[in-house]
């Protein structure tokens, strides 16, 4: 159920502190946290949108397993290292499980799954997006906003709001695209990027 071959062994390795990340791999496996995020989102939607009652206990057990068997074994710094790899909106997934269960441990895990490399500078209004993989960054900010909704921590509201305004004002063509090759770029590159084979994209 972990979405990647050898997933249980992979996460045992991660939980032991052996973490080698880039984008898009963790210890050589393609985006394993991203895959867990997609499973959590699917299970949540199956329960809330399709009234599939059986989905809720599976959702809770999967979120509990990843939280207790992986996240709880890691320091905050190690989790931030894990978040270098594309991970979707895993923070948002954990807020959703908290919303459905009322069990605070899921909100605590959501807090630890907020990527500091993005929410801290964006909460301060800094545009640090140049060169970053757009598809990796965008879902984090829906997660930051969801986290704000359930905690009232305005730093995350500011991060999400500033992200929207910065992307709209500094990274978007009039037709709506905001990246090429799924990556943000600097203002001075707009004309050249119009001719790029993999852009404009949104």
PLM regions and their residue ranges:
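Glycan-recognition and catalytic cores of secretory/periplasmic carbohydrate-active enzymes
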Residues: 1-202
């Amino acid at each position: 159920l972990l979405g990647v071959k050898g997933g249980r062994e992979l996460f045992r390795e991660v939980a032991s502190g052996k973490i080698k990340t880039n984008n898009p791999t963790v210890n050589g496996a393609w985006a394993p946290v991203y895959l867990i995020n997609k499973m959590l989102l699917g299970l949540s939607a199956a329960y809330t949108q399709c009234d599939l009652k059986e989905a809720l206990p599976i959702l809770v057990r999967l979120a509990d397993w990843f939280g207790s068997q992986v996240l709880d074994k890691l320091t905050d710094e190690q989790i931030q290292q894990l978040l270098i790899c594309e991970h979707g909106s895993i923070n948002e997934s954990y807020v959703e499980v908290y919303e459905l269960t009322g069990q605070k441990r899921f909100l605590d895990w959501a807090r630890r799954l907020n990527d500091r490399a993005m929410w801290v500078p964006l909460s301060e209004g800094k545009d640090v997006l140049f060169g970053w993989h757009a598809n990796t960054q965008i879902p984090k900010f829906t997660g930051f906003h969801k986290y704000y909704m359930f905690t009232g921590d305005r730093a995350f509201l500011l991060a999400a709001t500033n992200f929207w305004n910065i992307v709209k004002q500094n990274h978007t063509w009039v037709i709506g695209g905001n990246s090429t090759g799924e990556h943000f770029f600097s203002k001075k590159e707009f004309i050249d990027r119009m001719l790029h084979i993999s852009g404009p994209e949104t």
